[in-house]
């Protein structure tokens, strides 16, 4: 599969029913049967795990509560401020100056602002953000965004600031998919497709959260593992030393070698193929992977898939599937998830 997400046929998602469950997997006894096909969603932080969970909820009619909308709305404001602050810092470090000199002062005030901003922006702050984002030099810097860490949804939310920064703003389905909301604790959703009930567990992917993973291992029928291949040049936020791709591959290796998952199928989602392909022209893969022999985008994608498969070790080929995807692309994920769920049900027969 190449880098383009177009050309996918419209998918007919089956009629479904859904509900939420807050019961941790660890509360089930080992001899108790489960009424759902149980799925565990794993991956490092910012790999796209939660986006996959949100796609499942939206595609399979798992409606959000008002409190969940409120929670996500708060993080959307937080995302916007973090993005503009990251851009201002990148501008300060770059060889580009603002086209409008007044924006230099605005940028400095954004950088100096230590508030987390989980709510609607003041009129003054919103105007600063809009002016900085509209600056021609800032747009030139944004075109070079692959050279620094920036949330993939930055342009989406900054371009929609007028709509978002209102008292009656309620996130749309697209907003929910584009927002980055870190997973806290164990989240799970129960949904029904084609008369089969599934339960999908999502656990935080930061190092401090991974100790909780083992509490969810019992009775799992399949694993979804998200790996953001675009992170080949980035460092982990926890230590700013460890390469994110190396960490994710090591994590995948650990999961594959876990004795409790010896016969559990792993569905590997190689996420952010669009960002990956965009980066290649600016940040050569060979700068970070000396074992990459070179080639075009398809060669680079094949190389990344081979790295992931190698991390699975001696796992039998029948016990894993690899998919290249863009987790924020709802149509692509609808087709992918439909294929995956059918494969899981086939294994259970």
From Swiss-Prot:
Residues 198-207 are annotated as: G3 motif. This is Guanine nucleotide-binding protein alpha-13 subunit. It comes from the Eukaryota. One of its GO terms (cellular component) is heterotrimeric G-protein complex. Residues 175-183 are annotated as: G2 motif. Guanine nucleotide-binding proteins (G proteins) are involved as modulators or transducers in various transmembrane signaling systems. Residues 267-274 are annotated as: G4 motif. InterPro entries: Gprotein_alpha_su, GproteinA_insert, P-loop_NTPase. PANTHER family: GTP-BINDING PROTEIN ALPHA SUBUNIT, GUANINE NUCLEOTIDE-BINDING PROTEIN ALPHA-13 SUBUNIT. One of its GO terms (molecular function) is GTP binding. The keyword ATP-binding does not apply. G proteins are composed of 3 units; alpha, beta and gamma. The alpha chain contains the guanine nucleotide binding site. Belongs to the G-alpha family. GTP binds at residues 43-50, 177-183, 202-206, 271-274, 327. Signal peptide: none annotated. Residues 38-51 are annotated as: G1 motif. Pfam families: G-alpha. A lipid is attached at residue 3 (S-palmitoyl cysteine). One of its GO terms (biological process) is adenylate cyclase-modulating G protein-coupled receptor signaling pathway. Keywords: GTP-binding, Lipoprotein, Magnesium, Metal-binding, Myristate, Nucleotide-binding, Palmitate, Transducer.
